[in-house]
Regions:
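Surface-exposed, flexible coil segments in extracellular/virion-facing regions
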Residues: 61-80
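Solvent-exposed loop segments of extracellular immunoglobulin-like
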Residues: 54-62
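Repeated scaffold domains used in trafficking and secretory/extracellular systems
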Residues: 150-162, 201-212, 241-251, 277-289, ...
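Conserved beta-propeller blade signature
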Residues: 115-119, 166-169, 214-217, 253-256, ...
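Short glycine/acidic-enriched loop and turn motifs that connect beta-strands
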Residues: 122-126, 173-178, 222-224, 261, ...
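Hydrophobic/tyrosine-rich beta-strand signature of extracellular beta-sandwich/beta-rich modules
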Residues: 89-90
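A short beta-strand motif characteristic of beta-propeller blades
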Residues: 139-152, 192-199, 230-238, 268-275, ...
Length: 389
């Protein structure tokens, strides 16, 4: 345990007695920590207390954080939503007028580096979107973005993309019902806001992908490219009919679903179109840098090269693999295992290396009042846990 001492020097008389020795012991105060640590994660609590030697009588306490008064109790619960180092001060005085002071430095680290994010669009009429975080221990932090920044995400949040430790959150209606804007950019580890964009050109934007400083945003007209360095928004010609669904990024290319085709976008232009025999229901990057593509009729999972756009392998499924009315792919994958539900409550997985499909679970057996498959399912790429919305 670290101790932070301040010694008070007491003047000694020329004549020493037993009583004088007791009264002239050095007094000290330090800040104690219940956890014996001065490091916490955002929104966690550091339990501190004043520890005193050789002071008696009525005590008065004053706690400060970076010079601002925060408490007059003998204990203090330190918690902060923002990362960084904070100087915690403690001043103690007794009824004889003796004053002691000490300080310590507490470090607040990013909380959101390991876990899963759940984006909730919220009620369009009177709410905004919210972001929930579930850490690796299963502890959920609701409205995590608001707790950190004290501002609200945009109205009807639609999609989230993480790239280079930045999080991009897209909303459909932007600054409505108190929302801060159409697109929010935040640090992915701390959720601390970096920038907010609003734009009246876009018509109900639904999905985004990030390649370097360029953002590809799909709306009712097609796909636009937003250069974040200049804030210039440009329509990508040839993307009319882009589906309301997530895009995939491999290298410097973005892959966008059309009805029976996949648009390949590079440097703000469509450089290729990959055609398929049936309607697409999902696209995602594979564990080995290729693409998973799901088709509806016949139900199938196809592995596609992002370099020459040829089919590496294709498996026909014995159950349907539709995306429903949501804005997310029909499937989610970890390694070569693809999970899907056909927008229903029965969860399936297809092991691509073995070309085998099996039913994993009936969600209604776990959630009795489940009424609707709302938008998507996702698989934690580390733990393999499946999140079902």
């Amino acid at each position: 345990m670290k101790r932070y001492f301040v010694l008070a020097v007491v003047a000694l008389g020329l004549v020493f007695t037993a009583c004088d020795e007791e009264e002239n012991l050095n007094s000290s105060v330090w800040i104690g920590s219940e956890s014996e640590s001065n490091v916490i994660a955002q929104l966690d609590t550091l339990y501190l207390d004043a520890r005193i030697e050789n002071l008696s009588g009525a005590m008065r306490y004053l706690w400060t954080v970076d010079g601002k008064k925060v408490s007059t109790a003998s204990t203090y619960k330190f918690s902060q939503p923002k990362t960084g180092e904070y100087v915690i001060g403690l001043a103690v005085s007794d009824d004889k007028g003796e004053n002691l002071q000490t300080t310590m430095t507490a470090k607040v680290e990013g909380r959101f580096g390991k876990g899963a994010f759940i984006l909730n669009e919220g009620n369009m009429g009177n709410e905004t979107g919210t972001l929930t975080f579930v850490d690796s221990k299963g502890i959920a932090v609701d409205s995590a973005y608001y707790r950190v920044n004290q501002t609200l995400l945009g109205n009807v949040c639609q999609d989230l993309f993480i790239s280079d430790n930045k999080m991009y959150i897209l909303s459909q209606n932007g600054a409505k019902n108190g929302g801060e804007g159409l697109l929010t950019i935040a640090n992915a580890t701390s959720l601390e806001k970096e920038k907010v964009y609003d734009n009246t050109t876009l018509s109900w934007p639904s999905n985004l992908a990030v390649v370097g400083e360029n953002l590809y945003i799909r709306d009712n007209n097609g796909v636009y490219m937003l250069d974040t360095s200049t804030e210039v928004l440009t329509f990508v010609e040839g993307t009319k009919g882009a589906l309301k669904n997530r895009m995939a990024v491999v290298g410097d290319k973005a892959f966008v679903m059309g009805n029976k085709q996949l648009f390949v976008i590079q440097n703000g232009a469509v450089i290729h179109t990959v055609s398929f025999e049936s309607a697409l229901s999902g696209v995602a990057k594979t564990y080995d840098g290729n693409l998973w593509v799901s088709c509806t009729k016949p139900a199938s999972i196809i592995k596609v090269s992002p370099v020459d756009y040829k089919t590496i392998d294709s498996h026909t499924l014995n159950v349907s693999i539709g995306a429903g009315w949501g804005v997310a792919p029909a499937f989610s994958a970890k390694d070569d295992i693809i999970y899907f539900s056909n927008a229903g409550f029965k969860l399936y997985r297809h092991v691509f290396s073995q070309n085998e499909t099996e039913e994993v679970a009936d969600i209604k057996e776990y959630v009795e009042d489940a009424g609707i498959y709302y938008n998507s399912l996702g698989v934690d790429p580390v733990s393999g846990e499946v999140y079902f919305a």
